[in-house]
Amino acid sequence: MEHHLTTYITHDTLISALGFGTQENLEAIRSYHSGITLQTDKRIADTPLLAATLSQERLQQQAEAIGVSGYPRMEQLFILTINELIRQSGQTLEDKTCGLILSTTKGNIDLLARHTEHPDEAVFLWKMAENIAGYFHAEERVHVISNACISGVSALIAGKRMIENGIYHRVIVAGGDLLSHFITSGFGSFRSLSSRPCRPYDSSRDGLNLGEACGAVLLSSEGTEEHVILSGGAVSNDANHISGPSRTGDGLYFAIRQAMQEAGTAPQDISFVNAHGTATV
């Protein structure tokens, strides 16, 4: 399939345990700073564990500054990151040529753990999306993608295809998830949690460290040479198991091959591989 529109990533932002904003996160990474700390909050886990949590005090301050402190925590993060993207780019969601994609695996799942002032339906992804889109007056142009660990990649591919098919000129893609008791107990049941900082692909690896974050990018059909180009992407389904991919790697192989074909890229052209593996045990 030949595409005539190029999709650029023109702006980005991120909130994580390493900081608020892309620059703070970059500086922390360049300084070899880790966001992983020992967590003892019973709302997160029954027993202490190593994880990366963002500053609740800073989140509360920023949420109060824009009047969203009454929203669930996940929605606060989405609104803050999207707001920052709008501030950077000048692109508003009231513009009907701009779409909004929210990517998450669990959304407001933390609301299940305790009684709150929020209605029961707040835990549903559609309600989370409705609240966030309502804040930005974009109720008719919000889409939610929840596809386990590839939710973010799936959302970027969906945004790219929307631009290529002329549905939108620009798309804000935001993704986020929180650390909650639901999440830690789930990974704990798989015995996937490490008691030390994780060592991906190391011979002595023994699990992962969980974390929470929220980020957003602006995809656009217009850009310059200084912008990142989203040149190819693909999603496959190996129909293996709900909690694990095929051991033969067929699904991953098909997705990589299709993405490279779409981008017109050969294996020898690849200089960096960003790999993801849950616990990699």
Residue ranges, per PLM feature:
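Conserved active-site "lid/cap" helical segment
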Residues: 23-103, 255-267
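Beta-strand segments within the central parallel beta-sheet cores of soluble alpha/beta enzyme folds
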Residues: 99-102, 143-146, 171-176, 227-233, ...
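Hydrophobic pocket-lining residues that define ligand/cofactor binding sites across diverse proteins
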Residues: 162-163, 263
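Structural element of the ATP-grasp superfamily
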Residues: 82, 132-133, 218, 256
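Conserved small-residue
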Residues: 11, 29, 82, 100, ...
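Condensing-enzyme catalytic core mediating Claisen C-C bond formation in acyl metabolism
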Residues: 2-15, 22-51, 193, 197-265, ...
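Acidic, glycine-rich active-site loops and adjacent beta-strand->loop/helix elements
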Residues: 14-15, 104-107, 147-151, 175-180, ...
